Amino acid sequence: MKIMHQDSVDFAVNIIGWGMAAKINVLAERFRWLGNWRYSFAAVNSILRLRSQQMNVRIDDEIIECNGLFFMALNTIHTGKGMRMAPHAKLNDGLVDVVMLRQANRLRLLKIFTQIFSGDHVNDPLVEYRQVRNFSIQTKGDALTIDGENYGKTPIDVSVLHKALKLFADL
């Protein structure tokens, strides 16, 4: 994925996250000593400190403005340890899978979180799941996580670079 910032260009292979997704990644880094449980711990901690943000995104040609908790764009099924965030993702299909969570109360969010491990969260009406070729996050100055690194800030414009890399693996 090609990521256009206001004054630079970056690239991502797998994941771009905003909102709660970026906050969870920052917190998980502080709890590396928890091993595989650090992402689950960070997610529960973030749920307890729940705060939605104004989410302004463009997906293909549609503009969505709402209070949201997170936005993630993924090329593969998994994020964190065993979380099936994008259960229909394929690395080589030329699309990025977008998962958006609109504002929810803590109890509903806990329910959705437990469904992420099976991929069933995409059936919740507060979760929007799409496969797209490009998107933008139009908020200003919000932190991002890019391929597991806490890096960059919004706004960004992202486009899929289909077949830009040659992988030597069966997909």
Please place each PLM-identified region on the residue numbering:
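Catalytic core of DAGKc-family lipid kinases
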Residues: 1-69, 73
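N-terminal hydrophobic or amphipathic segments with adjacent small-residue motifs
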Residues: 11-13, 43, 55, 74-76, ...
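Gly/Ser/Thr-rich active-site loops/lids in small-molecule metabolic enzymes
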Residues: 33-38, 87-107
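A generic structural signal for short beta-strands and their flanking turns/coil linkers
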Residues: 51-53, 67-69, 92-97, 131-133
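A generic local structural motif
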Residues: 43, 57-59, 83-85, 121-124
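Short acidic/glycine-rich loop or secondary-structure boundary segments that cap or lie
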Residues: 21-24, 65-67, 79-82, 106-109
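Glycine-rich phosphate/pyrophosphate-binding beta-alpha loops
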Residues: 17, 21, 72-86, 150
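ATP/nucleoside-binding phosphotransfer catalytic cores, i.e., glycine-rich phosphate-binding loops
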Residues: 59, 63-65, 90, 100-171
